[in-house]
From Swiss-Prot:
Coiled-coil annotated spans: none
Disulphide bridges: 4-20, 8-22, 13-27
Taxonomy of the source species: Eukaryota, Viridiplantae, Streptophyta, Embryophyta, Tracheophyta
Tissue spec. comment: Expressed in flower, stem, shoot, root, leaf, seed, pod and nodule (at protein level).
Record family assignment: Belongs to the cyclotide family. Bracelet subfamily.
Listed PROSITE patterns: CYCLOTIDE, CYCLOTIDE_BRACELET
Entry domain remark: The presence of a 'disulfide through disulfide knot' structurally defines this protein as a knottin.
GO biological process, alphabetically ordered: defense response to bacterium; killing of cells of another organism
Protein name listed in UniProt: Cliotide T1
InterPro entries according to UniProt: Albumin_I_a, Cyclotide, Cyclotide_bracelet_CS, Cyclotide_sf
Cyclopeptide (Gly-Asn) cross-link site: 1-30
């Protein structure tokens, strides 16, 4: 994978450890994608409820960001929820 700020046209972003996702062919930090989103359709992992994740097919758990100004959460799959949610919260607070 490639780090945040780099192109993700051919190679995926480093996701789990760094908290980056591909948007408009560039890797961005997940909380930046969520903060700048105008609608939930701006990224396939944005959500406002667990049902949104299920409907989009991107998981079944919508994790909110600690920053209350970010109105969208991030979808995760329940089987990895404990590990991923912990990392999601840690990345959102420290970055």
């Amino acid at each position: 994978g490639i780090p945040c700020g780099e192109s993700c046209v051919f190679i995926p972003c480093i996701t789990g450890a760094i908290g980056c996702s591909c948007k408009s062919k560039v890797c961005y930090r997940n909380h930046v994608i969520a903060a700048e989103a105008k609608t939930m359709d701006d990224h396939h992992l944005l959500c406002q409820s667990h049902e949104d994740c299920i409907t989009k097919g991107t998981g079944n758990f919508c994790a909110p960001f600690p920053d209350q100004d970010i109105k969208y959460g991030w979808c995760f799959r329940a089987e990895s929820e404990g590990f991923m949610l912990k990392d999601h919260l840690k990345m959102s607070i420290t970055n």
